Each structure stands twice: as C-alpha cells, then as structure tokens.
Amino acid sequence: MNFPKQVPSKMPVHRYEAFHPIDLPDRTWPNKKITKAPQWCSVDLRDGNQALIDPMDTPRKLAMFKLLVAMGYKEIEVGFPSASQTDFDFVRKIIEEKLIPDDVVIQVLTQAREALIVRTFESIKGSKQAIVHLYNSTSTLQRRVVFGLDKDGIKKIATDAAKICLDLVKTVPETKVSFEYSPESYTGTELEFAVEVCNAVNDVWKPTPQWKTIMNLPATVEMATPNVYADSIEWMCRNLNNRESVIVSLHPHNDRGTGVAAAELGYLAGADRIEGTLFGNGERTGNVCLVTLGINLVTHGIDPHIDFSNIDEVRRTVEYANQLRVPERHPYGGDLVFTAFSGSHQDAIKKGFDHMAVDAKAAGKEVRDHTWAIPYLPIDPLDIGRSYEAVIRVNSQSGKGGVAYLMKNEHHLDLPRRLQIEFSKNIQAKTDSEGGEISPEDLWNIFEDEYLPTEGAPWGRFRLKGLSQTSVLGEDVHLIVSLTDRGQVHELKGQGNGPSAAFCNILQNYGVDVRVLDYYEHALSAGGDASAAAYLECSIEGETFWGVGIDPNTTTASLKAVVSAINRAIR
C-alpha cells in the first residue's frame, strides 16, 4: 500500500522558533527510577485562585484549605497577601483562629518590592512557621520588553529583595521563617543566568543543611518537551552552590499538555519538591495536577504520603472552591476514566476480574489484598473511593463482555458464554437503531422482554403454573405439570431421566419438538431462601434458542427456562 503523502499546511510556522536543546551529553536522569514521593506543596489557594474567573471567597478558601490539610499536604501556599485585602484577611484568619495544624507550614508569595514584602511579613505574624516565597522574572523576553533591564539589573532586584526578607525576619520573632526564591519564567531564562541569580540570592540568605532554602524552578510557561525541562533541572542541580543546603523545587505549567511528564522527569533529574494544584487548575492551561502525580505513584506501589482514598469528595470540594468542573476524562478523578465502552476492552476487563479472583483464591488471599492486574484499569477504583458501577457501560461499541459484566454485577446473572453472544446481539441491534448508551436498568428491561415474561409484562404462548414430581433412586422421574397454553390450563404427565428430560418428553407428546442441549444454573444470592437462575440451550424444531428461568426452586427454574426457550422460538 502506498500511503498518501502529507502536504504542507497553511499554519504560519515561520513566526516561531524551535527551543534550543541543552548540552548535557552525560545526563543521568533517563536511567533513574522514582522510588519515593517528593516533598509536595499545594498552590491551589494562590496560583490556582488567581486564575479563577470568580476568585474564592472565604468559605470556599476554607473548604479548600481544610481539604488539603485532611489529605496530608504539609506545605500549602495560602495566598498572595500583598496583592489583595481578601488574601491578606484569609492568611490572618487561619492564623488567628488557629486553623493551621502544628505540622503544616503555610507559604505566602510576594514580588520583589519592599512595600509588598513588608505587607507579606505583616500577614504571617503569629504563625508558628511560614515560607516566604519571593520571585522576580528573569527571562530574556521579560528583561527586554517588560523591565528594560540587563542581567545585572534583574539580579539586583532579586538580591535587594532577599536582603529585605532577611532583615524582616526579626519582625516576626514567634515565627520560624523559611525562604523560597523563584526565577519566574525560568524556562525562558538562560541556564547560566538562572543559576547565577539563584546563587546570588543564596549568598544573601546563607542556607545551611539545618535551615535550607527552596530554589523553585518554574515552567511559568511550558516551552519545550519534558526531557528538555529535565535536562535543565539536572544541570541546575549540578551547578547550584551549597546544594546540600538547597531544596530544588519544580513548578510546572501545562501549556504544551505535558506538565505531569515534566514534573516526573524533573524529579528524576534531581529535584526534591513539586508545587502544583488539585486537578491542575491554574493560569492558562493550568498547573501540574497533584492528583495525577500522586496516584501515579500509587500505581507503582509507592506511598504518595497523600490520602486519595475518597477521590469523589476531593473532586466535589475542588469543584465547589474553584467553581470549575473537573473534566470527565481527567486522570483518576473524571467521571469516565474507569469506564469502558469498547467491546474488546469490556471483555478483557471481565476476564481480568474473573482471573484475579482465581489467583487470589489460589494464593489464599482476599481479592482486595491481591496484586492488582486488570486490563485497561491501572488502579483499582475501590482504592480511591470509586466503585465498579461505571467501569463497564453499554453503547453501540460494546460487546458481549460488557453486557455480561453488567448482567453479573448489576443483576447477579452469570450468563453462559453462548447466551452472552446471543443477548449481546439484541443489545447491539437496539443501540444501532436508537443510539446512545444503555443503562443497567435498560439492560434488565431488554433482558426481561427477551427471556423473562413477568406478571406486569406477560408474553409467550406457554406458562408454567405448577408441577409435582416423584422419583426413586435409579429410576426415571415422574413429572406432572400444569401448563397454560394460550390461556387454557392443561394437566400433563410424563417421565424421563431428570425433571428437564421428563418435561421435554411431555412437550414432545404435546406436539412441541424440544431437546435440551446444554444447562447451567447458579444461586442468585447466598442463604437458604436464595433464588436460582437456570439457563438452558434448547433445540426447538431444529433451531437453537436459549431460555432463562428464575425461581426459588431449582427444578422449577429449569422448567421455566425450557418454556422461555420455546416461547422465544414461536414468538
């Protein structure tokens, strides 16, 4: 086959320049493996909040703050107190009302201007511990078009502000203050200049292994592939002075859609800490998603040190606080992320669950304690508070596996394989003709209409009204049935080597050519009063039909299944 050749587009690519790669031929991060969780910092209440159409009011901020604390985040950027009275008041509120646990450190952001730094220190008075996060932009573009300053001018802004921060520590003697510095627009800054500014700031602050500073390296705008960001982080880790006294922090954004990858590769490259938001809210395309990063660790058997066991509650709180919906396809938290519509996917998932149950039993373990290994599901939904209810849903792309899964899990009917195939054709015909999705309730209604006539929706020529049987060990069963034929009740007798065989002989004598080809049954629930489901594959007038019967008595259930098959054949 000759594949068609792609042709040039009309996109104005001449207006854009490729990002220059970093010369790091001896990079080591590709050969490393993540083995533990990073130091996390949530910036939902600052970076996330400033990106909202309707910024959070105090109740929404409190809900978010309490959620973050409950989940286990120990560093929380709670605002930009010099930027708005609302942020300042919120910082004061959580301090004065003693809402900050002793093991949680609040973080506050400030620009590199004296008046703003002073206001920031005023906001943290009375707190037990706080991180003052200082930033100024260092990128080549902003130096030229925003500040009109050379490198020395930009570096002086940073070091002057660092000195002011250091001097103001004495104004909050009751607070253990730590410092963080961000060369904002780091990804647009020459690495040599970025490390020069960071080292100059640290020369002012003079960190020690006992009192570390945080050097935060933000992808304020994501400008290249994640491997380039990782190269830059490894280069910085090699060239930062006094590295043992510095916490290297990442702050990826998602402009190119690879924020999570950038964070994970940057962490491999030597970073210690990651800043982000729950579900990735933030400026433009958002910050890196802490939910995705954290649960990614869980799927590799690494404790994230964060509690994601009730992801729906996390999502509800985040949606309330942000007034933004979490998309259906957002990793781990979206409504559809554990849902399979594809027939082949559904079949694989169903078989995976069946196989895992067998493996767990063989290992002497409960299924919930056994190693998770289900096709298409990287994590057990139950482990993050989701259910299996939405794992498989039925539409026109679904196959027998999905139909069988729902019938078993929603309606407790474990359909034999050939019956799965037969019934799925009915579902396929309905979805093809009507479109859309079929709910578990719809599925049951279709199944009843096809196999199980009820008092409310009767159909079929025959109905079994009653039966009695007698048998002696080693001899045929003698059966008497009350059979309704088009409303007329007939008492019929016969015998055979079992109840089903006796019933078929009775029907043969009545003029219905029926033979049982295969038979399955199971209890619908545990206990002495459980009903039984019987599935019989029958040959009727030379054609094959399945019948289904449900009854507290297993014999009655099997005879009902024969009647079901006959009624379907002549319907």
Name each region found by the language model.
Residues 2-46, 301-493, 528-531:
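A mid-to-C-terminal "edge-of-domain" accessory segment
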Residues 6-9, 14-16, 40, 56-75, ...:
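Alpha/beta enzyme core
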Residues 47, 51-52, 81-85, 139-141, ...:
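Short, small-residue-enriched loops and turns at beta-alpha junctions
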Residues 103, 142-145, 217-219, 247, ...:
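Short beta-alpha connecting loops at secondary-structure transitions
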Residues 224-359:
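Catalytic alpha/beta core domains of metabolic enzymes, predominantly
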Residues 467-477, 486-488, 493-546, 552-553:
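A conserved regulatory-domain signal marking ACT and ACT-like small-molecule sensing domains
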Residues 544-546, 550-571:
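Mixed-charge, glycine-accented linear interaction segment located at domain edges/termini
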